[in-house]
């Protein structure tokens, strides 16, 4: 049985920045409107909650963009997202604007420097994994791309897509509208034919996608970056089933498998997230991720896809770090989180 959620132990309080790192890994860009917050400031997930990019959970997409801005400015960066910082500024959340611009350092939020370095490296690794996935897919001849829960993803604008590539971005209407307008204000032009599909993934998004021009007879590269932890177990299965139903042979899918935690690990993770929430609250940003993530036991993503006819390849975060020559980390919590599997699959 998990211990009660009481006062945070001192070692947990000291690692607020590690908690921020963990929190960033869980965020997929999904957001829920401020109007759904109760008087306590906590979020209660409902079947019809909505989201934008400027309030409450909407800020999670901005948090990931902030991390990409930091990773892009790192010494010898693995990624380059020139739109990350200006998009963060456009959203206007003070904490993230100051972090993205360099005015505020991660060390100013928490006192665990290793956690901050790992967070930046991890977001770089994660971003590069999906960038490389799309590069490999187009090299194999795929010219139809679907980015699920796109948030502030700018791959349609920053990746060198081959001629004839069509990119479909799916997210909430407010998210799609904001990003499209903000990038237009930056005079940014997509490098592929971009179609923004404004639909909730809990609704009939396959029909909306096809109505936008998607051709299920063509091989497609799908991405579900950081998304699955924000879906209940049955929602995860429905999403994967829908992707399979839309996929022609040789289609590809990239995603991440949520960590399987025992009760003690789950309780510890929640406490660390609350520690991060306390640190953020001191900076004027109020968000408790424990109210957003589904910790329920669920089907193993790799096994589920394999059972649906996909040929699955997995890599752990540790393996991706090693492949880039990045140093390992000794913090137990970070090491555990680096066990998360990155999944690339091809439908046969």
From Swiss-Prot:
EC identifiers of the protein: 2.1.1.-
Q: Which GO terms describe its biological process?
A: methylation
GO MF, one term, reads: methyltransferase activity
Report residues binding S-adenosyl-L-methionine. 171, 200-201
Alphabetical UniProt keywords: Methyltransferase, S-adenosyl-L-methionine, Transferase
Q: What does this protein do?
A: Exhibits S-adenosyl-L-methionine-dependent methyltransferase activity.
Record-given protein name:
Putative S-adenosyl-L-methionine-dependent methyltransferase Mb3432
Question: Which source organism?
Answer: Mycobacterium bovis (strain ATCC BAA-935 / AF2122/97)
């Amino acid at each position: 049985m998990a211990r009660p959620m009481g006062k945070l132990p001192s070692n947990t309080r000291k690692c607020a920045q590690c908690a921020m790192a963990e929190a960033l890994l869980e965020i997929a860009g999904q957001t829920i409107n401020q109007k759904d917050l109760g008087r306590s400031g906590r979020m209660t997930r409902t079947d019809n909650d909505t989201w934008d990019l400027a309030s409450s959970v909407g800020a999670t997409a901005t948090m990931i963009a902030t991390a990409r801005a930091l990773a892009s400015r790192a010494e010898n960066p693995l990624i380059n997202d020139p739109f990350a910082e200006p998009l963060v500024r456009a959203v206007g959340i003070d904490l993230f604007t100051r972090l993205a611009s360099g005015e505020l350092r991660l060390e100013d939020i928490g006192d665990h420097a290793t956690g901050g370095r790992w967070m930046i490296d991890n977001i770089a690794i994660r971003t590069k994994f999906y960038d490389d996935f799309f590069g490999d897919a187009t090299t194999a001849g795929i010219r139809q791309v679907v980015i699920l829960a796109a948030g502030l993803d700018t791959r349609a604008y920053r990746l060198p897509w081959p001629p004839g590539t069509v990119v479909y971005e799916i997210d909430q209407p407010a998210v799609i509208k904001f990003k499209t307008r903000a990038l237009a204000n930056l005079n940014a032009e997509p490098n592929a034919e971009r179609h923004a599909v404004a639909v909730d993934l809990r609704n009939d998004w396959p029909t909306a996608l096809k109505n936008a021009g998607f051709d299920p007879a063509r091989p497609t590269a799908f991405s579900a970056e950081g998304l699955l932890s924000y879906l209940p177990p049955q929602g995860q299965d429905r999403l994967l089933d829908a992707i399979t139903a839309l996929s022609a042979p040789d289609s590809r899918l990239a995603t991440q498998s949520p960590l399987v935690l025992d009760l003690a690990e789950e309780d510890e993770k929640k406490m660390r997230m609350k520690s991060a929430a306390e640190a953020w609250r001191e900076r004027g940003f109020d968000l408790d991720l424990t109210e957003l993530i589904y910790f329920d036991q669920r089907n193993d993503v790799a096994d589920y896809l394999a059972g649906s006819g996909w040929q699955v390849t997995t890599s752990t975060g540790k393996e991706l770090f090693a492949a880039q020559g990045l140093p390992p980390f000794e913090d137990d919590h970070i090491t555990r989180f680096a066990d998360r599997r990155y999944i690339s699959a091809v439908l046969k």
